[in-house]
Amino acid sequence: MLAPDHARASDHAGLSRSPVDDSVADRRPILVVDDDAEILAMLRDFLESEGLVVRTAANGEEALDLLWEVEPALILLDMRMPVLDGWGFAERFRERRLRCPIVVMTAAESARRWAEEIGATAYIAKPFDVNELLQTIERHRQKDSKPN
């Protein structure tokens, strides 16, 4: 399980994981939005070790600011954050008519309901299995159809 109190993502090298599909040259980042600095660092390290480009934000406001600079392939979104929570982020995201799959990630039992409330593509419960995380990302991320 990938959890904040576990070792760094690079220490998970011995685990059997589902490979991320790199047959498509997609360099658009995965945007991870979470107020827990350890989770951000761990997810960034792990996803980068899987060949993905990652950007991080500590709250919804930072994430919205980043969206002026990058077009993510997928957003991993925590719901309970200071400054601007997941609900506020989703509302402002939609107001800007942005389109990108959003995967809610939360430890709350209400994950499914919250994902439905904000119109998220999917949800994943914390702590999550690395295989489940990679499969969710691969299943829902937008592929860049432009050649490099």
Residue map of PLM features:
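Charged docking surfaces used in two-component/phosphorelay signaling
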Residues: A41-S49
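Hydrophobic/aromatic residues positioned on beta-strands within the core alpha/beta folds
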Residues: V103-M105
